């Protein structure tokens, strides 16, 4: 009963933050998602219990897609045959910046949530370390507040561009 009440509370909070009556589901899967077309937010149920920090992070992140990622952007990306992972990483950086602006209290939720995910090696870095990752993955980790992500001067140009993203068109360019 307590678990069902917690799921219902997260669902209500997600709807309030998203400012619409999105459909929230909890199911066994690797990560959270937001289906733009169906207006559905999926939260994972993991074999190892998901922490409050991780779940709050995922809610804050996915409602960012509900608020600021349009179906038009998804369609344009597909038409232009852009790399989905690149677009998703850049869009994640953009929408998380917007969530933090709109809901300043979310800044600490993101930090605590990403710290918890990193502790369980959610990002699959393992013993190799951040320096073994390619540029786009390091950019992703940088925006996920992972400490120790370093960039060359040339790479910093791309990080700076990502930090300045404000529109969907800028993400796609």
Model-derived features: positions:
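Short, functionally important secondary-structure microenvironments
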Residues: 1-173
């Amino acid at each position: 009963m307590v678990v069902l009440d917690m799921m219902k509370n997260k669902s209500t909070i997600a709807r309030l933050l998203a400012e619409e009556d999105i459909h929230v589901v909890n199911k066994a899967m690797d990560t959270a998602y937001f289906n733009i077309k169906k207006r559905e937010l999926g939260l994972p149920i993991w074999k190892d219990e998901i922490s409050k920090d991780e779940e709050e992070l995922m809610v804050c992140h996915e409602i960012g897609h509900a608020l600021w990622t349009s179906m038009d952007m998804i369609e344009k990306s597909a038409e232009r045959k852009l790399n989905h992972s690149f677009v998703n990483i850049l869009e994640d950086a953009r929408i998380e910046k917007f969530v933090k602006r709109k809901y300043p209290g979310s800044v600490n939720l993101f930090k605590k949530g990403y710290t918890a995910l990193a502790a369980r090696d959610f990002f699959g870095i393992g013993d190799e370390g951040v320096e073994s990752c390619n540029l786009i993955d390091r950019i992703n980790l940088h925006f996920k507040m992972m400490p120790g992500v370093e960039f060359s001067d040339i790479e910093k140009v791309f990080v700076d561009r990502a930090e300045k993203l404000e529109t969907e068109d800028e993400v796609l360019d």
